[in-house]
Every structure is written in C-alpha cells, then in structure tokens.
Design a protein with these regions (language model features):
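An amphipathic, basic-hydrophobic helix/alpha-beta surface used to engage anionic
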Residues: 1-208, 248-251, 258-259, 264-267
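Von Willebrand factor type A / integrin I
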Residues: 89, 243-249, 255-337
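Short, flexible loop segments at the rims of nucleotide/cofactor-binding pockets, characterized by
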Residues: 131, 225-229, 253
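Conserved phosphate-coordination/catalytic loops
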Residues: 173, 226-233, 298-302
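Von Willebrand factor
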Residues: 209-247
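Residue-level detector of flexible, active-site-proximal loop/helix-junction positions
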Residues: 137, 159, 202, 228, ...
Length: 337
C-alpha cells in the first residue's frame, strides 16, 4: 500500500500566510520531488526564522504514522514599513529647510557667486552679468559655487518606554517606520543620512549616501529593541562634536521619562541646528487600547502639552503625532504647513 508523506514548514506566529500553504501532502515514491510555495505577511519588523520542518509518514488509512523534526531553518529580515513621501512633499517648503547645503568650491548649481566666464550658446540669459558686458563689450555669465548634498541626522528613541502600548501600535513602531521613510526619501534626493538609535546603548550609522546606505539603515532599524533608559543629553553630548554645522536634526521620540530632553534640545538650538521632533504619543496608544482611564489620560496629556509648548519656545519644530496621522501630515504640521 502507498504511504502518505506530509511536510510542514513552521511559520512564526506573528506572520500570516497570504498565499499558498506551508505544508504539502504527497504519496511517497522513489525519486519524487515537490516544492512548497507560499507567501507570508509580517506586520512587525525584526529578525525571523522559518523552520524547523516537520515530516510525517503515515499509511493510506491514516492509522499509523512516524514523525520527525528536521532542523532546517531559513533566516530573514523584515524591514520597517515605509511611507512614500510624494512629489507634492518635495515641492512644499519643508524640504528646502532640510537642504543644509554647503559649498565645495566647484562651479555648478548653487546660490553663491564663483566666477565670471564668457557666454556660450545655451547659457541662460538670467546668468548674464550685464555690468561686465557694459565694461568689456563681451557677454559674460555668472558661475555659481556648487552646493554639496545635505547631512541629515535622524535620532530614534529606543528606550524601554518607547514600547508602551500594543505591540503593533507604539512609539517605537511609528518611530522606526518614520526613520526608514525619511532615510529613503532623503537618500533618494542624494542627501547624506546618518542615524542614531539609543536605548540601553547608543548605536549609530555614520553618514553616507546611496542605496547601500539605505540597506544599512533599514537593517539597524529592523533590529531596534526597546530597552534601557539612556538620557537624550548623553546622546547629544556624544554626537555634537561630530555633526556638521547646519545639519538638520530629526528626533523621533514619545518624549517620556527623560528630564534631560529640554536641555538636550536646547543645546542643539543654541548652536543654531534646525531641529524637528515627531512625537508619537504613548498616551494615545494606551487610551485607544483602553489601558488608560479618562482622568489619567487628561492629567498626562496636560503635562505633555506643557512640554511640547516649552520645546516650541526654544524654536524646535515639533508635532504631537496622532496614531492615525500620516507621516507626511505630521512632518508638515511640525514645520508649520
């Protein structure tokens, strides 16, 4: 009598099988091959493994069987979900504030005067220097000093308090998604992006450009774990000497349980850094999940509003990021658009 072979691939509980199946039934025979094909959907970023594989052999009547577990694993990484920042965002005034361009002493597109040269066919008439033409009788054009790409610094709060709320809706989930989306956007603009993630230690990705840099950043964000309680002031003291003047700072945090936040951001502002804070509120996540009563919510919301007002008074661009708000909306709100 033929025997039936069942092969089953173990899938992590947080994943949902979107297409296909993670098991197959087949008749056992010589030199037979088969494939298990399925698509999984994972709502949470992180490192995962498929496996082990369970193999069960049973008779045609299903009365007897033998089962063995094969320790075969496939490891893979789930990046944070990213929001596309559309062309309308690029045309707004928000990214102009983020340019942070510096001159590199070469002619090219830019804002500062570099030199005069003779007019060539195809040059813009707007570039003609009419005063030089009046003096020399020759058409001369202004060359500009080429602007280099920006240095963008993204800081992600990964302290233990960042995981307050449901596992799929908390400040760390929103912050890592925002950091990934912003990194993709700025790198796509050929800017230089660096990322700092801090919790029980300070993990940094040095500033760089290109697709490889995006992969490095996404890998760090995928592995971010909520733990520890390093104050923001420690992070600021460590990175301040290494940040170029004019680099925009984007800080992603729920702003909770850290008495150093105001002074730390004041240090940035005192050195004339442009600071944007997007703050996913753990209060909203807890209240929506009915883990916080109305009275407690109102008291803590008032304290949070006072803190946000104090940071605005320092010249920090800040947005209280509500759970259902798109990143582009939150960013535009922080910048006052």
């Amino acid at each position: 009598l033929p025997k039936i072979l069942e092969v089953r691939d173990r899938v992590p509980e947080v994943m949902r099988i979107k297409e296909g199946a993670n098991y197959i039934l087949m008749e056992l025979g010589p030199r037979r091959e088969t494939f298990i094909e399925y698509t999984v959907e994972c709502p949470l970023r992180g490192f995962y493994s498929l496996g082990p594989v369970t193999v069960r052999i049973q008779d045609a009547f299903g009365l007897f069987h033998k089962e063995k577990e094969l320790h075969v694993y496939n490891d893979f990484l789930v990046f944070p979900k990213m929001e596309d920042l559309k062309e309308t965002f690029v045309k707004s005034r928000v990214p102009k504030i983020f340019t942070g361009a510096v001159n590199i002493r070469q002619p090219g597109p830019g804002s500062e005067f570099y030199s005069l040269r003779e007019y060539f066919e195809g040059d813009s008439f707007r570039a003609i220097n009419w005063s030089a033409y009046a003096r020399s009788g020759k058409l001369m054009v202004n060359e500009r000093e080429r602007d280099a790409v920006s240095d963008i610094i993204i800081i992600v709060d990964s302290r233990a308090v960042a995981e307050t709320g449901p596992v799929s809706r908390n400040a760390l989930v929103y912050s890592t998604r925002a950091a990934a989306s912003l990194a993709k956007y700025f790198l796509g603009r050929r800017d230089s992006v660096g990322v700092i993630v801090y919790g029980d230690e300070v993990v940094s990705v040095d500033r760089d450009t290109g697709k490889k840099q995006l992969y490095v950043i996404l890998t760090k964000l995928a592995g971010a774990v909520a733990r520890g309680n390093i104050p923001l002031q420690v992070v600021v003291n460590r990175i301040l000497p290494h940040i170029n003047k004019g680099s925009p700072i984007i800080f992603l945090s729920n702003l909770e349980d850290d008495p150093t936040i105001v002074n730390a951001l004041r240090d940035f502002r005192a050195r004339d850094f442009d600071v944007t804070v997007l703050s996913p509120s753990s209060l909203e996540f807890e209240f929506d999940a009915k883990r916080l009563d109305r009275t407690g919510y109102e008291v803590m919301k008032t304290e949070r509003d006072v803190l946000i007002g104090e940071l605005r008074g320092l010249g920090v661009n800040i947005m209280d990021w509500e759970p259902d708000m798109l990143l582009s909306t939150a960013l535009a709100g922080a910048r006052g658009f």
